[in-house]
Amino acid sequence: NGVSIDGLKVKDYSLMYGSNIALTIDSSGRTTQPNQPAFLAQPTSAQLNLVPNGYRDIDLGTERFDRGSNFASSVFTAPITGVYQLNMSIGLQNNVDKNADFYQIELSTSNRDYAWIIDPNFEASIGTPVYWHSTLSVLADMDANDTAKIRFYQGGGSTQTDIGTNTYFSGFLVA
């Protein structure tokens, strides 16, 4: 039956509160926290011919995992106040428009936006890039019910750049 102290219970290599397992330790000393928020999502299909001069939320319809069920409709909602590791990678493909003034990928939270910006014509001697991958990782301070999503912005240029299914957004509670 384990040992209980003020509702906290130690039983079968697990630390529990009520019937919720907070921490499990295996015979080698490895630990897992099954209720620790964590997610990884990707687009279900490519997002084609993005229109320049406007923010575009990235559609992430395929969840690889979602511990805690805090990711829905391409948005992560922090279940508790804490510091979260958030990661994104956007794969641009199919005739990336090097005539655009700039590309901006953004990890947007309720408290702050984190951006990566580049001029796609930084090397005039190359032809039109077919693929371009950019990543961004941050430790973000989030309060309970704050949200995070990823966005894309193309300044100028033509409607020709696509976002591929190799794009992803992931995160987990650190502290």
Give residue ranges: language-model regions.
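Acidic/polar, compositionally biased interaction segments
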Residues: 115-121, 134
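Beta-strand-rich receptor-binding modules of extracellular spikes/adhesins
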Residues: 1-34, 156
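A short, structured loop/turn motif at beta-sheet edges
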Residues: 79-81, 107-114, 140-147
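Short, conserved secondary-structure segments in the cores of folded domains
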Residues: 21, 72-74, 138
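Terminal (often C-terminal
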Residues: 17, 27-99, 105, 109, ...
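Short, surface-exposed tryptophan/glycine-enriched loops
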Residues: 126-147
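Short beta-strand-plus-loop segments that form exposed binding edges in beta-rich domains
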Residues: 151-158
